[in-house]
From Swiss-Prot:
GO terms for molecular function: 3'-tRNA processing endoribonuclease activity; ribonuclease P activity; tRNA binding. GO terms for cellular component: ribonuclease P complex. RNaseP catalyzes the removal of the 5'-leader sequence from pre-tRNA to produce the mature 5'-terminus. It can also cleave other RNA substrates such as 4.5S RNA. The protein component plays an auxiliary but essential role in vivo by binding to the 5'-leader sequence and broadening the substrate specificity of the ribozyme. Its EC number is 3.1.26.5. NCBIfam families: rnpA. PANTHER family: RIBONUCLEASE P PROTEIN COMPONENT. This is Ribonuclease P protein component. It comes from Mycobacterium marinum (strain ATCC BAA-535 / M). Belongs to the RnpA family. It catalyses: Endonucleolytic cleavage of RNA, removing 5'-extranucleotides from tRNA precursor. GO terms for biological process: tRNA 5'-leader removal. Keywords: Endonuclease, Hydrolase, Nuclease, RNA-binding, tRNA processing. Consists of a catalytic RNA component (M1 or rnpB) and a protein subunit. It is an enzyme of class 3 (hydrolase).
């Protein structure tokens, strides 16, 4: 699971990442990546999840969120401390395995950083 310091909680962070960040679309997730212009010395990368009701029932949405948090955690060490990532789950994400979600998330992050021209 993600620690509290690695979770996005404020809507302003979500909005800035989604609106100003680089977006990559995968079959089951959309990944938004943004490097914050200002970050404190003790800052760490933050990840936020968007799981819409279209994904399924509350139980299915929670299951997808748990899977995404689980696969996002090991990727934190590859991110810059100022990086902000929002993962939007698409309805088809409830039918796929965690391994497939991890592969899509890795691919989405790689493509987003290539598009942004940022080093990791």
């Amino acid at each position: 699971m993600l620690s509290a310091r690695n979770r996005m909680r404020r809507s302003t962070e979500f909005d800035a990442t989604v609106r100003q960040g680089v977006r990559t679309v995968q079959p089951d997730v959309i990944v938004h990546v943004r490097r914050a212009k200002e970050c404190a010395a003790d800052s760490s990368p933050r990840v936020g999840l968007i799981i819409a009701k279209s994904v399924g029932t509350a139980v299915e949405r929670h299951r997808v969120a748990r899977r995404l948090r689980h696969v996002a955690r090991p990727m934190l060490m590859n991110l810059h401390p100022c990086d902000r990532v929002v993962i939007r789950a698409l309805p088809s994400s409830r039918h796929v395995s965690s391994a497939w979600l991890e592969q899509q998330l890795r691919s989405g992050l790689r493509r987003a950083f290539e598009s942004a021209g940022a080093d990791r």
